[in-house]
Design a protein with these regions (language model features):
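C-terminal alpha-helix
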Residues: 139, 143-148
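A conserved beta-turn-beta hairpin within the catalytic core of GNAT-like acetyltransferases
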Residues: 29-32
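A short gly/proline-enriched turn/hairpin at secondary-structure junctions
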Residues: 35-36
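Unchanged
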Residues: 42-135
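Conserved N-terminal beta-strand and adjoining loop/helix that marks the start
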Residues: 1-21, 40-43
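Short alpha-helical scaffold segments that flank and stabilize functional sites
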Residues: 15, 27, 53-57
Length: 149
């Protein structure tokens, strides 16, 4: 598995005016699997462009201002998922995370997009989110918290 490359991706730590972070529960996982918006970087796309596109695709709005960014952070998939996700081409993701200030209203958020990824969403304190995500991403989220606080 270690010979496989990382998929390049990006993610959004989207904070509202109360300092809470946007999180949503994945639609494709029967377990409570929450996460922040994230996704791949398309060829020729800058990470900052990708994160804005991902917001539109996943939560229906890009009303956000980038106010900070992380270093590149990696996570590995568990062995049993490597062959099931991304057609077995990647061992995990190398991501650039952006701290973003939400500039819209809650009514601007629409997770019922063309290709829905989430079943519900909430504004949460960042430390609570760590316990709600899939276990293999918890160290990544701790790193995000340390870098973007």
């Amino acid at each position: 598995m270690t010979s496989l490359p990382y998929r390049l991706g990006t993610g959004a730590v989207l904070k509202n005016s109360e300092g809470l972070v946007f999180a949503a529960q994945r639609i494709d996982n029967p377990e409570p699997a929450w996460q922040m918006p994230q996704g791949g970087i398309d060829k020729g796309e800058a990470p900052s462009q990708a994160v804005m596109r991902e917001l539109l695709e996943e939560i229906g709005t890009d009303k956000a201002l980038i106010i900070g960014q992380s270093n590149w952070l990696d996570y590995d998939l568990p062995e049993e998922l490597v062959g099931k996700i991304w057609k077995g081409k990647y061992r995990g993701q190398r991501q650039k995370w952006f701290l973003m200030d939400f500039q819209g209203e809650d009514s601007d958020i629409n997770i019922e997009t063309e290709h829905p990824e989430f079943r519900e969403w909430a504004w949460l304190p960042f430390p609570e989110l760590i316990d709600l995500i899939v276990p293999f991403k918890r160290d990544l989220y701790r790193q995000i918290g340390m870098e973007l606080g």
